Amino acid sequence: LNVTFDYFFRQHTVSIGKVAFNKKSSLNAIDAKAVSEMVRDHVERYLEALQATGVKIPAIGEMWPKSVGDERAIVSMVKELKQAWNIGDYALGNVIEILEQHGIIVIEIDNSNGFDGLSGWVDDIYPIIVLNRSLNYESKRLTALHELGHILISVEHDARKIEKLCNLFAGEMLISDERLIDILGGKVKGIFINELENVRDSYGISIDALLFKMKRLGIISKSAFRAYQQKKSNDEELRARVEQSSKAKAETSHKFVNMVCRALSLDAISSSKAASLLNISMVDLRALFTPLAES
């Protein structure tokens, strides 16, 4: 589980409910239980840090979850959400930080067994998103927003339809249909990777996700999309270029560490408590928190 010895003696006061694994996840029952326990432990420590600092988690709003049934409803929902969160129809900054600013607890874990992300609720109060730390920049952003879709979209469809709606939601959050059409124009016959790389670099969305969106909007034909998939499958050099991330490091969050640091600076917790919350040794804690001055 990658936890300290102290973990086994901690009292767990937080119960995890309504955790829905991403359909793409290939976690078996043992791995799923291990992930659930890591989530349980992290959320407990997260809430303890919140309590120590007096910070409140903002509510995501009474308008969510929302019932949607088709593509048009998803586009409308994303516009409404961006307006409510005051993020506009522009390239999104750090997606994880945006989610945390609006009441979502985001947890990153180390797992290499086909797990991308999951979402759910803690005690039916706090929405959570769990991400595989090893995902690259574009994949982590898309997965985080896909899981946000699971939180904000009412479950009134079968699993396959929900996955499709969440994929549409994530893509629309990263770059709206209107914005993409403004950039690329109308229907085209050919696809030039250079142009898509520019959009990828500006909006933090993968080339594959862009091409899927272009097919859906009719910018490229279904046959052109299939031809691209075939070429990518057979051309290692193309595949490597398409799947190359625009950034060497994926997005992450420093909110939890910053909360513990603030609690420590307020003398709300001891150094040993800070180390326990962060699940690190005292030596690592001293290396992490180097005071510049004391009053």
Model-derived segments and spans:
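Active-site hotspot residues in diverse enzymes, especially metal/ion-binding acidic/histidine motifs
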Residues: L1-S295
